[in-house]
A protein has these predicted regions:
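Conserved mid-core segment of classical short-chain dehydrogenase/reductases
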Residues: 8, 103, 108, 116, ...
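Amphipathic alpha-helical dimer-interface segment in Rossmann-like NAD(P)H-dependent oxidoreductases
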Residues: 60, 112, 151-171, 204-209
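Catalytic Tyr-X3-Lys loop
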Residues: 138-157, 174, 198
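Short alpha-helix in the Rossmann-fold core of NAD(P)-dependent oxidoreductases
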Residues: 149-156, 160, 186, 194, ...
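Conserved glycine-rich Rossmann-like NAD(P)H-binding loop of the short-chain dehydrogenase/reductase
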Residues: 67-82
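Catalytic loop of short-chain dehydrogenase/reductase
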Residues: 129-131, 174-212, 221-222
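Conserved amphipathic alpha-helix within the SDR
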Residues: 84, 88, 95-98, 103-119
Length: 232
């Protein structure tokens, strides 16, 4: 983590959805350490949740490997613009698209904008997530359960469905899963349930497209500062 603070980090709380720009110290997304080698030269990618956290790190890596990127995010405009700057600093095109991917129409609009403004689509990274911490099952409201599935599972389906027809010569669909799929945190029941549902490695591999899920452990991001704000 060149130039970045090392753990343990001070605990911080923010209202949803959280802001990377407000975190102290700032997370490390590979800004100073990642070096590309042209592995994605000329590729076009959509990354959801690319304003911060793992999504921003993926956007930086993809751009430094030669890909143009559509950055899909909810409403964190300052964070998204910083990711855009980092992509453009790597010499690649960056397109911003804000909105709630829990809405199927927004999912279709994201893909349409990528195809229109990037000139095609080769890679879809389903990374955006919603999570909230609750002390017990009884504390999870119906609306919270539905929201978790809309953002984490339904959006993945609608984005993939919209993307596949544009991947004429193959492509890649990558889903960000979680260690919670195997070792669920008891305070993250809804989130752990959907991450278990996501981790079916070959499910998106339809009509010649490569499909993968990638499980991650702890990653310091604005979501961590926000998810327990109202519920802990």
């Amino acid at each position: 983590m060149n130039g970045h603070a090392k753990p343990p980090f001070p605990k911080q709380k923010q209202p949803m959805p959280g802001r990377t720009s407000d975190m102290r110290p700032q997370p490390d997304h590979g800004e100073d350490s990642y070096r590309g080698s042209g592995k994605l030269a000329g590729k076009k990618a959509v990354i959801t949740g690319a304003d911060s956290g793992i999504g921003r790190a993926v956007a930086i890596a993809f751009a430094r490997e030669g890909a143009d990127v559509l950055i899909a995010y909810l409403s964190e405009h300052d964070d998204a613009n910083e990711t855009k700057r980092l992509v453009e600093d790597a010499g690649r095109k960056a397109v911003l698209m804000s909105g709630d991917i829990g809405d199927p129409a927004q999912c279709r609009a994201v893909i349409e904008k990528a195809v229109s403004e990037l000139g095609g689509l080769d890679i879809l990274v389903n990374n955006a997530a919603h999570q909230a911490s609750f002390k017990s099952l009884e504390d999870i409201s119906d609306d919270e359960w539905e929201l978790t599935f809309q953002v984490n599972i339904h959006a993945m389906f609608y984005l993939t469905k919209a993307a596949v027809p544009h991947m004429k010569n193959g492509g890649a669909i990558i889903n960000t899963a979680s260690i919670n799929a195997d070792k669920p945190n008891p305070t993250l029941l809804a989130y752990a349930t959907i991450k278990g549902a996501e981790f079916h490695r070959r499910a998106p591999a339809v009509a010649g497209r490569e499909g993968n899920s990638r499980k991650h452990g702890g990653a310091r991001a604005d979501l961590d500062a926000a998810y327990s704000f109202d519920h802990a």
